A protein has these predicted regions:
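Hydrophobic alpha-helical transmembrane segments of multi-pass integral membrane proteins
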Residues: 1-451
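Asparagine-centered strand-capping/turn motif at beta-strand->loop junctions
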Residues: 489-491
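Extracytoplasmic/periplasmic beta-strand context in beta-sandwich domains
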Residues: 42, 181, 311, 497, ...
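Extracellular/periplasmic metallocenter environments
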Residues: 447-455, 510-586
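Short beta-strand/loop motifs in extracellular/secreted proteins, especially
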Residues: 485, 495-498
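Short amphipathic beta-strand segments in non-cytosolic proteins
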Residues: 501-503
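Beta-strand-rich interaction surfaces with strong enrichment in secreted/lumenal proteins
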Residues: 71, 474-477, 505-510, 518-519
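N-terminal edge beta-strand
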Residues: 455-484
Length: 586
């Protein structure tokens, strides 16, 4: 049986990854039409793409690391396991898409989570059996242990996710969310990633590295993960931070060895600095940086109830970049056909490689820094689009490699040195984009430009404002003319929002669960406010401040800080209530 026939099962098992990638790109183009679209896009990536990839490649590398090839008659059952997994993923996403349709939607999500968790639990047992049956003393056996730990984490993360879908009163909901992220990103993805990179990093950089402290690395990661997840579940921020630091120390051990690989290659780069190489080097750095940020936030918010989760750096900087970089290298290697054929496939995947790698990493950093909504949109397109190009390149790479194998075309020649001019070009594109939007700093984000706080009646009206379901509640506020308006703004939605007024008062970007105090200024005339996040105003996220010129509440020289209480006359629907009128209590 030839090599292409032997890997037929592998190509079939990888089809769900391709389908989910294509679906993610298409859905992102019309995401505004979906309910809870941010959750849907994130979980299409994490469940659809990442989970299928980890289950496939952990099986692939377990066989390689243990030198124990499974018989071909086991492959049909493996394909059925992928089918079962994807049924569970579809159920989870369906449950969340029907969230606004009926209250018991979480039952669908819970069933899906059970199927997904059960699939990975079985996968962990399957890998464990292979480990026990293999010969002892295999060099990369610790990486197989990492795959088993990875597969054991997802059922626990799925359980936390099902509990989130059911809904628990605070602070349990916030605790479950942080636990869910720690188990799934640091546990499921983290163990699989570090376990694979023990071999793949030096292979992709085409140099040698020592593999000496893998047991210590995985022991520290395990201790850190268990500690952080337990601390998150019980609301102990310092324990979470301590666990994250232990996890960070664990992954720094191999990163130091990988850094030596990079230094060695840069002394004589030749054709070795590619998109895949830069991606697998940058992804662990994003993981380290994000761990530091999350540990700091957990330590400074001891109850963990308001910890802002750095989701995008985890998912894009670490998980997505690592996945695309690794696949750009191992897919041609898996097809095989000799050095020239494999090199041709890799070179096709590396088209504009350094240009794309720069857009991903520098573009993502700028995207996370700026609060300018439309600039964030453009930068996100550049960063994620540079990764999505993988889908376009795949058929060309496969066709070119098979052409060399079948001797219908010549192999592509090696480059003599890295194309560093691509880095310059990418930086120039980013600089042009940023300059066209007036720079990274949004001039109106400070909340003070143009705001008048002196004069008027000397009195202050304070109002609590909620943002949820692409609406402000209340969306009309009446304030005595001459009073200063101070808002306590809370984002109770599942996506980021902000609030900006005609006079320049601006909350800045607010993540879900965040709360800010905004001094709007003295109200002398009616004034409009809106959410500046791209597309939100067009969907109706606007409000009005009306100046009451009747004079009934004016007068008095002393500063009074009343509290505005909003009493609805009918049940609130979708987080809004047009009947709310401020009642000033002195």
């Amino acid at each position: 049986m030839n090599r292409l026939a032997k890997t037929a099962w592998h190509r079939k098992a990888s089809k769900p990854v391709t389908v989910w990638m294509a679906a993610l790109v298409l859905i992102s183009l019309v995401h505004w039409a979906l309910p809870n679209y941010r959750w849907v896009l994130i979980h299409m990536f994490t469940l659809g793409i990442v989970t299928n990839s980890i289950m496939l490649w952990s099986q692939h590398f377990t066989e390689k690391f243990l030198h124990h090839q499974l018989p071909e008659e086991t492959r049909p059952w493996q394909l059925r396991r992928f089918a079962i997994l994807n049924v569970g993923i579809l159920l989870i996403i369906t449950g969340q898409l029907t969230k606004d349709m009926f209250a018991q939607h979480w039952h669908i999500t819970a069933v899906g989570a059970t199927v997904v968790g059960g699939s990975l639990a079985f996968h962990a047992g399957y890998l464990g059996r292979q480990y026990l049956q293999a010969k002892r003393g295999q060099r990369y056996a610790p990486s197989v242990i990492a795959y088993i730990c990875s597969a054991c984490c997802l059922p626990l993360g799925a359980l936390a996710g099902a509990a989130l879908a059911a809904g628990f009163p605070n602070p349990w909901q916030e605790r479950l969310l942080l636990t869910h992220l720690i188990l799934n990103i640091l546990g499921f993805v983290g163990f699989a990633a570090i376990g694979s990179l023990m071999l793949l990093f030096p292979a992709i950089w085409r140099t040698q590295a020592h593999y000496e402290r893998a047991p210590l690395t995985f022991a520290l990661m395990s201790i850190g993960l268990t500690t952080a997840a337990g601390g998150a579940l019980f609301g102990q921020g310092l324990i979470v931070a301590g666990g994250l630091v232990a996890y960070l120390i664990g992954i720094i051990i191999p990163i130091m060895s990988w850094g030596a690989c990079v230094v060695t290659v840069l002394r004589d780069p030749r054709d070795r600095v590619t998109f895949a190489a830069v991606s697998v080097a940058a992804a662990p750095l994003w993981l380290c940086g994000t761990l530091i940020v999350l540990a700091y936030r957990a330590a400074t918010d001891l109850g963990t109830t308001a910890v802002s989760l750095p989701t995008m750096p985890f998912l894009i900087g670490f998980a997505a970049q690592l996945l695309i970089g690794v696949m750009s290298n191992i897919l041609p290697s898996n097809i095989g056909g000799g050095p020239k054929a494999t090199r041709t496939g890799m070179l096709v995947y590396d088209r504009a490689g350094l240009f794309r790698a720069t857009l991903v990493n520098v573009g993502l950093a700028c995207w996370l820094y700026t609060e300018n909504s439309w600039l964030r949109v453009v930068l996100s397109i550049l960063a994620m689009g540079s990764l999505a190009v993988f889908l376009v390149l795949t058929p060309f790479a496969v066709r070119a490699q098979l052409g060399v194998i079948r001797k219908t075309r010549e192999p592509l020649p090696l480059a003599e040195k890295p194309k560093t001019n691509q880095i310059t070009a990418a930086l120039a594109v980013l600089a042009l984009v940023i300059a066209s939007f007036g720079g990274l700093v949004d001039g109106g984000s400070g909340g003070s430009s143009g705001v008048v706080t002196a004069g008027g009646t000397g009195k202050t009206t304070e109002v609590a404002l909620d943002m949820k379901g692409l609406r402000f509640s209340p969306d009309v506020i009446t304030v005595p003319a001459g009073n200063q308006l101070v808002l306590t703004v809370r984002n109770s939605d599942t996506m980021a929002h902000d609030l900006k007024f005609d006079n320049g008062a601006h909350t800045g970007r607010m993540n879900p669960g965040e709360q800010k105090r905004l001094e709007v200024g003295v109200i002398s005339a009616d004034m409009a406010g809106w959410c500046t996040i791209a597309g939100h105003r067009a969907q109706g996220m606007e409000m009005t401040v009306k100046a009451d010129t009747s004079g009934g509440s004016a007068g008095g020289a002393d500063t009074v800080r009343p509290t505005s209480v909003h009493k609805p006359t009918h049940p609130i629907q979708n987080g809004t209530d047009d009947s709310l009128e401020p009642i000033t209590e002195r």
